[in-house]
Design a protein with these regions (language model features):
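Short Gly/Pro-enriched loop/turn and capping motifs at secondary-structure junctions
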Residues: 65-67, 102-105, 125-126
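Conserved anion-binding
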Residues: 1-96
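Short loop/turn elements that flank and shape the SAM/SAH-binding pocket of Class I
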Residues: 46, 105-106
């Protein structure tokens, strides 16, 4: 963690599924002076964050299975965003909701409508005829 901080990192993201002691890792990151995000894979329930949600700055919901670009958006992610937004509201957490995978203009609009704050749009941008225009259109969601 120290080495990452020393590189100038402002936020460190850890996968829920990769941490045996998530709370300890979150606290170590915060103690190092960085913000912290926790990532959930598509099959991991939002409920797994109940005990940690007040301690994190952002939650990244994967809307495809990690590994390679160009996958189709997993539709039940919309329900997960709604559930996470409710958890954040009910606990007084200030965490942002980020979604990565299969994000384009259509899915991006749906995600923003159900409560997403941050969108990661790889192929929608890099395969667009005009990347600048696509970025502008995504930002306007």
């Amino acid at each position: 963690i120290k080495e990452v901080k020393d590189l100038g990192t402002m936020m460190m993201n850890v996968h829920y599924e990769a941490c045996v002691h998530l709370h300890r890792v979150v606290q170590q990151i915060k103690d190092a002076g960085m913000k912290v995000a926790v990532t959930l894979n598509p099959s991991t329930p939002v409920a797994m964050l109940v005990d940690i949600i007040r301690d994190v700055d952002m939650v990244l919901l994967m809307s495809v299975n990690p590994g390679f670009g160009g996958q189709k958006f997993i539709v039940h992610t919309l329900d997960k965003v709604r559930e996470l937004r409710e958890l954040i509201t009910n606990t007084g957490s200030q965490a942002l909701i980020e979604v990565d995978g299969g994000v384009n203009l259509e899915t991006g609009r749906q995600l923003v409508e159900v409560g997403a704050d941050v969108l990661v749009a790889g192929n929608a941008v890099f395969k667009a005829p005009d990347m600048s225009d696509m970025i502008h259109r995504l930002k306007s969601l």
